[in-house]
């Protein structure tokens, strides 16, 4: 975990004044490494001793030592792009880094994933009267993918990327409904409120999120993904891939739990979709001509 990621992970545990320092640094880490302690205190509207207390809470000896660690973190990645990519990387270099990072992260998540949580989630999903998938930002795309998969399972499925419709759906939940909320940071206020609304209306809430987050704490069941990617600083890449893969795991578990007869229904759905596609054999014949 680099210094930027460490600051982000500790935000909730900082005092109000120390958090002001953290937010100034996260907003402009490049400026922070060139700032004096007096300038930092002035910008954060705190005292210089507060800046030093913040630095010590980050396991550094003071502001100069903190700036050194911060500079090293910035050298290890390009903010708002990817933690593994540097400004001067060639196309061959950054292409390889992105693929290697994705494969390594998925392998790490595979080994760290709580299989009992997966099993419990499959239990809840297979018993659900209605399933809703919600996310915001990049996680909305993952929720949409989940809707596409579970829509084939002959169970009522709800999806929306509009927060008003999401809130209305959670307010209309009832016993037997399951709401799946997806957020890498687990700190999106709207999603935490959705979890509260759904539970107040007797629904079960499954969260795909990071451990120890407000969303994880509010959910009935949290499937925590250990992905070392700070999406406040970098573009979400591997975290989204991990979420998509876990959705595939849940869909597979759902299918297996429902049994062979249920898979016959999936076969009929696949057959019905064939008419919407060009026939591969006809396309091959056309190519031969």
Swiss-Prot record:
Residues 37-56 bind DNA. Coiled coil: none annotated. One of its GO terms (molecular function) is DNA binding. This is HTH-type transcriptional regulator HexR. It holds the Pfam family HTH_6. Represses the expression of the hex regulon (zwf, eda, glp and gap). GO terms for biological process: carbohydrate derivative metabolic process; DNA damage response; regulation of DNA-templated transcription. Residues 121-260 form the SIS domain. The keyword Repressor applies. InterPro entries: Homeodomain-like_sf, HTH_RpiR, RpiR-like, RpiR-like_SIS, SIS_dom, SIS_dom_sf, WH-like_DNA-bd_sf. Residues 1-77 form the HTH rpiR-type domain. Keywords: DNA-binding, Repressor, Transcription, Transcription regulation. It comes from the Bacteria.
